[in-house]
Amino acid sequence: MAKKVTGMIKLQLAAGKASPAPPVGPALGQHGVNIMAFCKEFNEKTAKQAGLIIPVVITVYQDRSFSFILKTPPAAVLIKKAVGIESGSGVPNKTKVAKITKEQLKEIAEMKMPDLNAGSVEAAMRMVAGTARSMGVTVEE
């Protein structure tokens, strides 16, 4: 028989830098999960992706064991990394902060494909382009 699920926790953590400090400790502590075991496992799995924010979905079972699924980094984080900016524009419709090429968009879209509900890479590119525009990043043709 399958283990009974008692909780689902969604967090966005810096790759390789999970520690028992907030937000990880309190979120896992209230479900009775071994915080250090999670941090160690998460940091091992994300060590290669240093510098990125990684969304993680943690499933907690009745016997206080857990499993987790790593998602792809948010499109906004990948766009900021691709164009080399610290943050998006405060007023994206007026102030443009950077330009992104179609090749960069395609690269990000292909990386995000497993987490997007897009049927094709072109549809995924349009989603990523929309995120870029909402950050004040101009998409070059």
UniProtKB/Swiss-Prot annotation:
Listed InterPro entries: Ribosomal_uL11, Ribosomal_uL11_bac-typ, Ribosomal_uL11_C, Ribosomal_uL11_C_sf, Ribosomal_uL11_N, Ribosomal_uL11_N_sf
A cellular-component GO term for this protein: cytosolic large ribosomal subunit
PROSITE patterns attached to this UniProt entry: RIBOSOMAL_L11
Any one GO BP annotation for this protein: translation
Domain of life of the native organism: Bacteria
Key words of the record: Methylation, Ribonucleoprotein, Ribosomal protein, RNA-binding, rRNA-binding
Protein name in the entry: Large ribosomal subunit protein uL11
Organism: Clostridium tetani (strain Massachusetts / E88)
Gene: rplK
